[in-house]
């Protein structure tokens, strides 16, 4: 699945995402509560000459978990190694990474909830006591050797913290949840990105793009690039409110930040199931979509913005959705 409002990175975005990524806490707009706490924790660890406690960053995709991990490493003056859970298939894969870490390095694991159980459990002693057991040989000749690791900080990023086993989750001394950004923070991000990308944009244009960006910086930056194209071809090169409205309407992003799939979800619940409640598996089957995709990609924003409610009996359309999005049909 690839959509312009997708929070996960899509193919080809890595290079310009890195260009736009803040390198310091001071350049990171939004998430003030999380940011201020991390600054204190990092400063205290540096003062003691220790590695920072292990950090778990939770929240929907595109909110800055990877960026914060890099800022933590930069602020600590530490090396960072980056990987993702699907790339760590076996204990040996993890052992190779852990044994290569320098003192006080940061190890970032994206999608950490997708680690297999045996790999997850292999991290326990590494996180608590900085050692792992390495098995050499096979069969009756196999023996276990204790390998001491350099002190390090594990930073895990997850969109589904509830899937982590409690013993694993409890080993993170710092657990923070990132929230969707407000429009002012997104406007600041857009103005900064426009300056880096050399895009002419006025305040009203930035506000309009921010309003439709689903509270997600990655989406905001992606929309900025597409609106820039319309400004260059259909306008005078400046991203104004008028050109932003025109471009985003052409891209199928409405005034609420919803796209066609979002509206299909809402219409399905309202029209086919009388507003709900309806189970997530039923919705997934009706839309020919994966349950995980609905729960991780679409639902967080729809719930956050008050379009649907999640109940024990299923999903329910809210009065706000009926009087806004669905009233515009």
Swiss-Prot record:
* Residues annotated for DNA binding in this entry: 291, 310, 315
Q: Where is this region: Small ATPAse domain (RuvB-S)?
A: 182-252
Q: Do you know which InterPro entries this protein is assigned to?
A: AAA+_ATPase, AAA_lid_4, DNA_helicase_Holl-junc_RuvB, P-loop_NTPase, RuvB-like_N, RuvB_C, WH-like_DNA-bd_sf, WH_DNA-bd_sf
Q: Where is the composition biased (Basic and acidic residues)?
A: 11-20
Which is a Gene Ontology cellular component entry for this protein? Answer: Holliday junction resolvase complex
Residues that coordinate or bind Mg(2+): 66
Query: Which residue ranges are recorded for the region named Head domain (RuvB-H)?
Result: 255-329
Keywords attached to this Swiss-Prot or TrEMBL record, sorted alphabetically, are:
ATP-binding, Cytoplasm, DNA damage, DNA recombination, DNA repair, DNA-binding, Hydrolase, Nucleotide-binding
Q: Does the keyword Disulfide bond apply?
A: no
Instruction: Identify one Pfam family in the record.
Output: AAA_lid_4
As for subcellular location, the record says: Cytoplasm
User: Record's domain comment?
Assistant: Has 3 domains, the large (RuvB-L) and small ATPase (RuvB-S) domains and the C-terminal head (RuvB-H) domain. The head domain binds DNA, while the ATPase domains jointly bind ATP, ADP or are empty depending on the state of the subunit in the translocation cycle. During a single DNA translocation step the structure of each domain remains the same, but their relative positions change.
NCBIfam families given in the database record: PRK00080.1, ruvB
Give the protein name, as stated in the record: Holliday junction branch migration complex subunit RuvB
Q: Which organism is it from?
A: Bdellovibrio bacteriovorus (strain ATCC 15356 / DSM 50701 / NCIMB 9529 / HD100)
């Amino acid at each position: 699945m690839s959509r312009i409002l997708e929070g996960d990175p899509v193919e080809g975005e890595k290079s310009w995402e890195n260009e736009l990524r803040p390198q310091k806490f001071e350049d990171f707009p939004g998430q003030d509560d999380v940011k201020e706490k991390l600054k204190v924790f990092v400063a205290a660890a540096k003062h003691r000459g220790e590695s920072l406690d292990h950090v778990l960053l939770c929240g929907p995709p595109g909110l800055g978990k990877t960026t914060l991990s890099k800022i933590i490493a930069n602020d600590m003056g530490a090396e960072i190694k980056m990987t993702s859970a699907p790339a760590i298939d076996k204990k040996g894969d993890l052992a190779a990474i852990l044994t290569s870490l320098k003192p006080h390095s940061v190890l970032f694991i994206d999608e950490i909830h997708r680690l297999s159980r045996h790999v997850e459990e292999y991290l326990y002693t590494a996180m608590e006591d900085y050692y792992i057991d390495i098995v050499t040989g096979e069969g009756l000749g196999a023996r276990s050797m204790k390998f001491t690791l350099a002190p390090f900080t594990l930073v895990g990023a997850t969109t589904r913290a509830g899937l982590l086993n409690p013993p694993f989750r409890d080993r993170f001394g710092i657990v923070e949840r990132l929230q969707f950004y407000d429009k002012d923070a997104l406007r600041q991000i857009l103005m900064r990105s426009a300056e880096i990308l050399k895009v002419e944009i006025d305040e009203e244009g930035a506000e309009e793009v921010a309003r439709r960006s689903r509270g997600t910086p990655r989406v905001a930056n992606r929309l900025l690039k597409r609106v820039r194209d319309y400004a260059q071809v259909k306008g005078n090169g400046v991203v104004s409110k008028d050109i932003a409205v025109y471009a985003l309407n052409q891209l199928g992003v409405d005034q609420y930040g919803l796209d066609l799939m979002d509206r299909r979800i809402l219409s399905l619940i309202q029209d086919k199931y009388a507003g709900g409640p309806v189970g997530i598996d039923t919705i997934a089957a009706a839309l020919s979509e994966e349950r995980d995709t609905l729960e991780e990609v679409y639902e967080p924003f729809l719930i956050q913005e008050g379009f649907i409610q999640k109940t024990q009996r299923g999903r329910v359309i809210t009065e706000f959705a009926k009087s806004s999005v669905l009233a515009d049909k």
